[in-house]
Amino acid sequence: STTLLASKSHIANVTGTDISFTATGSEYKITSTTTSLAGFAVRDLITVTGTSNNNSTFTVKTVSSANELIVEEIVTTETAGSSFTLDHTGFVSDKAKGDGYYSQPDGVHTVSYQVNSTMTGSIKMQGSLATTPTEDDYFDITGTTFTADQSTLISTANFTGNFVWVRAKATSVTAGTISSVLINS
């Protein structure tokens, strides 16, 4: 099996009046002067609230410094001043080669999710048919969603498709840890 995700925990919200948004060409930044953004990591999903123009969910593309994130999605330039909150609501795993990458005819995959007893949120698989996918190329794979209920700690799903790439996506995460996501293709 391939490990898509080893261990990932929910992190606390970040709130600040010095957080701003900048769009320069095709680079989209969330920055601050003193509020630390260092807790966020590449592929984290952060939901922004309190802004005039950027209340949305963004995928971290690069952590440039403790005070600067580059995100995948388009931001609207907005200066600091009001209190903005960045809520860590999930993340996506690194991509793994699916059966379509190897031109396998059966397309059968099995995924295993393991979480701790305080985990809240959902995990699902996404696939892409693109050879070099962007965020927009991924789609949810039917029948792979696991919603944590604090009692089921391991869940599995089988799915079929000749996906070139597959990855896991965790959403609505408010607490707890995903211990691992494993896949067999």
Please annotate each region the language model reported:
Residues 1-12, 87-106:
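Transition segment at domain starts
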Residues 2, 132-145:
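Tryptophan-centered short beta-strand motifs
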Residues 8-42, 47-91, 150, 172-178:
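Small/polar beta-strand repeat architecture
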Residues 28, 107-111:
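Structural beta-strand segments of beta-rich domains
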Residues 32-34, 111-115, 168:
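Aromatic/hydrophobic beta-strand junction motif of beta-rich domains
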Residues 47, 122-126:
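Beta-strand signatures of extracellular beta-sandwich domains
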Residues 91, 97-106, 139-185:
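Beta-sandwich interaction modules
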Residues 126-132:
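Conserved Ser/Thr-centered positions that define the repeating blades of beta-propeller domains
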